[in-house]
Amino acid sequence: MTDLLRIEDLHVGFATDAGAAPAVRGVSLRVGPGEVLALVGESGSGKTVTARSVLGLLPGTATVRGRVLLGDGTSEPEEDVLTASPARLRTLRGTHAAMVFQEPSTALNPVFTIGWQLAEGLRAHGRGGGKAERRALAVEWLDKVGIPDPATRADQYPHQLSGGQKQRAVIAMALALGTRLIVADEPTTALDVTVQAEILELLHRCRTDFGAAVLLITHNMGIVADLADKVAVMRAGRVVEQAPVRDLFAAPAHPYTRELLAAVPDFGTGGRPGPETADGEVRDVVRAAGLVVDYPGRLGRKGFRAVDGVSFEIRRGEVLGLVGESGSGKTTIGRAIAGLTAVTGGQLQLFGEPLTRKSRKSKTAGRIGYVFQDPATSFNPLLTIAESIAEPLVVHQRELGAKEIRARAESLLEAVHLPRVYADRYPHELSGGQRQRASLARALALRPELVVADEPTSALDVSVQAKVLDLFGELQRELGFAALFVSHDLAVVERVADRVVVLHRGRIAEEGPTSQVLGSPQDDYTRRLVAALPVPDPVRQARRQQPVQEGVAGS
């Protein structure tokens, strides 16, 4: 079988003030017709640089050697992307290979309709005949990739489509040109789990229905188990292991691969036990009854109800997981509890007392810690890590002297397993995982009774995520704080939460003990969430998919 893509001894470096920084070191890969090769590894491993080299999308500061050969599958690949002229590259992009980016909005022009952009790609490559024919083809391809009401969507702009619909449109643009190879760089990272499942199904159809191969860049091992035929594991710019997907998961040969797989939360293997509380000690740290949160409309537009009549409680010493898709109201509830968003209706009690507009600052001051999703934007870039961690102490415990505050900040750094020398570093000098540890240290500075963690691991690599989750659990058990853990990742929630509340469009779909809700869901929406989550085991994932495929075949 001839290859569609053959990468031979690829080396890529980038010019810096300190000299050339190597990003890819001697990578060799092959992708045949109809194959899905997953390229996995942590941030900085060289995955995306390797993917961009396939389409000649590296910046001018890059120094490249090796060969990146593209073919059409009928003969040995001969087109070397690295030596192709700009005009030839424009031809190769779309016809031989196409890129699907992590954020589809960056690949779509906001001032042109979806249909126009698809038709323009056909025109630029001399496909589709006249204007009317190209328009008809655009609508046809939008329909083929599963976009509802394609004729209407063709006349809409990118901002009028959901994230999943935009990603489908980008894939349609590639398939319409007859591309044989789709390079998908983290194509589902920005999507909800159910939308992710739909895009994965579409990528599967790209090879079964349209004959395309896929080079899949991802850090999600569940997606790898669901979609890939072969896996290449990258670390520090090198491929450390390549194997068929089932072989790699069953018997990883390289220590780094074993470490990577061990760090993946394995959904369906059981959660943590609930907190042990003596009789008569149970009290609610948070109690919500008929909670309503509205966001006012602007410029004459109608307002939006983000949370609609929600009732739940968080008990002392327990972790409550709050799960649901984007727009379900998860973050809004967390912000309302922390006093960052006003409550419109219903009742919200904190520590046994009602929370009102007037009392929300006094009730929450020093008793609630908040861990934000993106630690980079929650730190002042002009303050050192020690100064940021010390801020709550400076504001709420003014009786402390400068030396004592500094000592407390350094002690908190040690508690989250960061060396004391990091105290004088600035946020940009820390990695994402280190910043999230520092964010957790700041949240715990006042020894709060409740911690609100809003998607605290969603931006982290799988191994870093595992370390942060272990740290969170260790500190929660040691300090005994209650926690609201907001996440869209069911595997993460299963690992850390005692109980789970499932939100759907601002309302509670289901709630209960974690093992019960995620192990035997009763609500249709919860069942869809659980079914949509790929597990990091090709054999188990194939068994989970079998009933779905049989249902489709029988329908």
Annotate the PLM regions.
Residues 1-267, 274-535, 540-555:
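ABC transporter nucleotide-binding domains
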